[in-house]
């Protein structure tokens, strides 16, 4: 066995998700170009990488150094670390919650999977029944008496779907209206006293509130599963009335579904599988309850009855190794680059534009990692339990040049959910602007109930339009010698806009972004930095292009 074959599952997208596999299709979209890896042009790019990347880390280290005059301003946010005697930047509240509870989550993962295997082996209890019982126990342990609020929303939506099942369009609209309204209800009444609803419920106000009292924070993920069940049920009920038979009755069809995610999404289960018990088991499924990744109800039920080929030791082992690598990468960054604390205290006075930009860039990498690591832990947990969900992030945050592709690769299971339940039902590419507005409006509201986020969603649609139009215009010149380089120039502009927008929203804020832009365009050193950074981005984009071409040469056609 060669070294390449051993390392391949650790570096390829196929090693992340069994859904990504070589495709036999041959058409204009799959045509590949000769490899550029060994050309003189790319040898120059390799030299540039060897010079620029270390300089980027060095700039971040300088900004985080105890010798930096700004160090005293953010030192109070640092904690005692465990790597090389350095302090760790544990100031991000979201990742701190995960990091501080990592041991507890790991123990829970081992306990859950061990108990489940013992119970399934020694009793006649099915996977779905075990998930129901354990899920309810976990729900109460996590949210205490607030579990009643979650169950109330679940039951109301269940009732709407089943009462109006013979009127699919009315039922669907009603489900969406109430589903979205739950986000507003929770935002305004998450701690509304039970006693105010009915006096005899007042004792509930003094009961156990759970390990996670803020139940509403994680309800957004619960809502996606609740909507998935009810929409899948309505689709199945309508097909049943039209006498459509189950799609996996024959052995041939069953084999196809085992290998085809798209078929599993619409797998026509017996109507008895859409029971209240299975509904609760799915919504409260412990490994994915807190934050996903998202799997549809149809897919979950199918995988609970049939083991997919991806549930094997080799795939799960390599996935676990990739998780550990991501976890340790985050630890090294937090110990050596204190960029989160710097951003929180705005401790960048007299730093160069290059240093400030690296503070922002590594902040974006931390945001990516703080989402990727929990998602991979929960997906690993589900894999150990026999459920294969979509991988949420198949591209590094630094390996993106397209806004559209970035959206598809970032929170991928959520994107798949949105495509299935919003984008396609509203017409898909036939009404691209309208469906995009609907999609990003829901995405904005789902993330947080704020007008600025709704405006952010609409602005994203406006920002996507130039890329969509430019792609359509220049797609006729794909064979031209200059095409790749013109695309790279456009991609550099795209990256600048995406970086500045994300730095403004998530890292530097208005003050930091204004200072960065002022230093970049109003000083000689800043202008030099912009030129050199743009050249570096141009080189990076060329590498990104070739990575995707190499994937195509191996039959991998990703849209991101």
Swiss-Prot record:
The keyword Disulfide bond is annotated on this UniProt entry: no
A GO CC term attached to the entry: mitochondrial membrane
Cytoplasmic side: 65-101, 153-165, 298-322, 374-432, 475-485, 548-560
Catalytic residues (UniProt): 447
MF (Gene Ontology): O-acyltransferase activity
Annotated signal sequence range: none
Keyword vocabulary terms for this entry: Cell membrane, Endoplasmic reticulum, Membrane, Mitochondrion, Transmembrane, Transmembrane helix
Membrane topology (Extracellular): 1-43, 123-131, 186-276, 344-352, 507-526
Example GO biological process: glycerol transmembrane transport
Keyword Cytoplasm in annotation: no
TM region(s), chain numbering: 44-64, 102-122, 132-152, 166-185, 277-297, 323-343, 353-373, 433-453, 454-474, 486-506, 527-547
InterPro entries linked: MB_O-acyltransferase, MBOAT_fam
Its membrane topology: Multi-pass membrane protein
Reported consequences of knocking out the gene: Results in an increase in triglyceride (TG) synthesis with a concomitant decrease in phospholipid (PL) synthesis and exhibits an altered plasma membrane lipid composition. Shows defects in cell wall assembly and stability and abnormal cell wall morphology. Deficient in GPI anchor remodeling, mutant cells only contain the primary, unremodeled phosphatidylinositol (PI) and are unable to attach remodeled PI or ceramides to the anchor. Defective in sterol lipid distribution.
Similarity section: Belongs to the membrane-bound acyltransferase family.
Protein name: Membrane-bound O-acyltransferase GUP1
Taxonomy of the source species: Eukaryota, Fungi, Dikarya, Ascomycota, Saccharomycotina
